[in-house]
Amino acid sequence: MKETTVKYPFLTKDVKIYEQDNGHKIVLAYKEGGMVNVSSWVKTGSINENEKNNGISHFLEHLMFKGTHKHPAGEFDHILEARGAIVNAATWKDYTFYYVTLPKGENNENFNLAIELHADMMTDPVVPDYEMGAPFNINDKTVTDKRERHVVIEEIRMRKDQPWTKVYNATNH
């Protein structure tokens, strides 16, 4: 594993960047205050998709929250949110990120728990077959199934006509 140290003027301590042999980077940055953030950034988004697999990055983002072999669906969120965490993810054109932000806790207990749970979610996700949903026509507005495939399609439909989406798409090709 390769280690790099970077100095930033607005941080009191050096930032450590660890790059694994597979290219995965782990960045550790200390910032004064009572909150911590654990996040993973994945180099995938709609820019990597084509007409046949359009939306797959966003779909996988949703499926990552369906549990792991160690923690069933909902347990990850329940444990962290009970400690005041915000747990979420987002998919953009060129990346997808997953994050947990929460109070550090005594002796960094929440930070350590967040790292453990986040690492489990990122390395051992379970994708239940029933969440895939049956094939359907994306233009069929009568589909009411709430499995993740349909939830993502509905989110795409809702955003597609938003003015900010049109501006973003027109200026970010």
PLM segments and residue spans:
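His/Glu-rich zincin catalytic helix
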Residues: 1-78, 99, 116
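Acidic/histidine-enriched segments that form metal/cofactor-coordinating
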Residues: 69, 77-173
